[in-house]
Amino acid sequence: NNEVFLRDGGRCSVYPKEQKRMKTIHIENNFAQVCPGLKIGIIGAQVTNTETAPRLWEQIDDEASRIAAAYKIDEINKRPAIQATRKAYRSFGKDPNRYRVSSEALCRRIIRGLGIYRIDTLVDLINLVSVRSGYSIGAFDADRIEGDTLILGVGKEGEIFRGIGRGVLNIEGLPVYRDDKGGIGTPTSDEERTKQ
């Protein structure tokens, strides 16, 4: 039984399951040309999710207070990680003001006094990392990913993608991770079929 400790001493248990082959990532050439310095990674863990984690929410509330004190609404998109993703959106022909990066959207909610959605411990943790870092972080149930390779490319016209809580999302021109079945995540939203 392994445990992951949160910065303030909180913890969530991580239980090993049968050894699964880690997914590999292939970056399409057209994407790599626009984002040559891109660095990505995959972290895999067998976890037991819970409805809420009070100590995690203490960290989330602290980070929300820090964001609200440090930024005005029109300054959020100047954070380097958010700015880099917005630049990629523009390079692929997508308007980052219409299709916001999830980390930017979360920070904007905080500044407007709306807070962060409370979903469950795993999603809440991912949202904290996203808000703190400025990067859009995807979290997927590995058992729902088809195949051994994820492909990072650009959304195509007419490509079907059902964003979590958003319905059908036009991902043409958005960076998108795909498995053997289709899109599973963009920096704006993850796909319904791969949620935990």
What is each model feature region?
Residues 3, 9-21:
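Short, Lys/Arg-enriched N-terminal segments with co-localized hydrophobic residues
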Residues 1-2, 165:
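A residue-level detector for conformationally permissive "hinge/kink" positions
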Residues 12, 21-196:
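Charge-biased, low-complexity intrinsically disordered regions
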